[in-house]
Structure formats: C-alpha cells, structure tokens
Amino acid sequence: MEDFIKSSKKVLLGNKKKGYTLPTNNKLYPAQWNWDSGFIALGYSHFKLKYALDEIKTLIRGQWKDGMIPHILFHDLKTDYYPNHSVWACGNKIHSSGITQPPILAIITKLILDKNRINNKYKADFKKIVKGILKYHKWFIKFRDPNNSGLVSILHPWESGYDNSPLWDEPMSKVKIPKNLKYKRGDNKVVNPEYRPLDIDYDRYVTIK
C-alpha cells in the first residue's frame, strides 16, 4: 500500500502545472479537464491541501458568467489537441470548450472538507469554491432542466464522461457528417488507436460540438 501511495503522489506531482494538473503527462490530454480536476484535487487532499484547493480554484476561474464550468480549460494554447481553443472559440477569462461535464465538484469538496481540519488560512478559499459550485448547479437547473422535470440534460457524449459507451451508437448514428469536414486528430497518434474512438465516432463528436 505504501508503494501504491508513493507512486500515486509521483504521478500527480509529475503531471502538475501552474495551478492545475494534466490528466496525463503526454499530448493525449494537454489541458485541464473538469471532472478530472475534481478527482485530482481529491488525491492531493490526502497529502497537500493547498494543491487540492488550487486545482479547484483554477477550474472555477474558468467559469462562465452564466455559471457553466466548461469541460476543458486551455491554459496552454500551443497543443496539437483537437478540437482546440481556436475551434471552440469561447471562454471568459480562460479559453475553454463550450460544453460541460458531470458536476462532481460539490461531492469532491464535501469529501475534502470531511477529511481535513480547515483553519482560517483556507476558509476564504472554501467560500469562493462553494460560491462557484452553487452558481454551477444553478446553471444546470436553469439551462439543462428548463421544464423542472428533475432530469438534467446533456448535449454531447463528451459531457457524459462515458462517450465511448455503446449506448451512444444508435443516437449518434443519426448525426449527418458534413462532406467538407476536415480536421487532424492527434489523440490516436499518442496512444494505441485501439484505445481511442473510431474516426467515424470522432467525426460525429466534432460535427455536433
């Protein structure tokens, strides 16, 4: 167990950038991902509370004015990832995608609070985080459940967190791909293509983004 903890710390710290952490330390995911940051923050909370709070605060810094927290924040604009910041062409203070991901930040923050004794040094940070999370949840209620059905909608497989699931095969098969659609993928060059979505799937993802 001790070796496992040690190697886990090494991975987190090895992927760390200024204020945020990459999901993988290669070109596969060269940005800050919404719910990845939540789990990363939870990991940091076991040995470095400041890093955990920095991770979440940086994510909330990319929050849109209407309350949405995007699923990607592009802090480094020089990447081969597609679709990149120029394709999405949105974001407020930080370049971002135009969709979101499952709102796990509230659960993550609660777990961190339960685990750590919070002194005055971090109270202001937690207040800022909770304020951002509340605004985020209100956004989901207003824009993703406008009829008050109690069911929040998602608009893209990437918002689900399980975009490679066969559950998407039938609905996504109805997406009409433009004949002039052109782009260059990099994800299937970094890792084994067998572990990545098929080109036809990616074409559909990009079409409806």
Give, region by region, the residue ranges found by the protein language model.
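Helix-terminus loop motifs that line ligand-binding clefts
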Residues: 49-131, 141-144, 148-159
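Solvent-exposed loop and edge beta-strand segments that line ligand/cofactor-binding
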Residues: 20-38, 42-46, 83-102
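Extended, hydrophobic/aromatic-rich amphipathic alpha-helical segments that build helical scaffolds
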Residues: 38, 130-137
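Low-complexity, Ser/Thr/Pro/Gly-enriched N-terminal "stalk/linker" regions
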Residues: 1-32, 53-54, 58, 72, ...
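Acidic, low-complexity intrinsically disordered regions
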Residues: 29-31, 84, 135, 154, ...
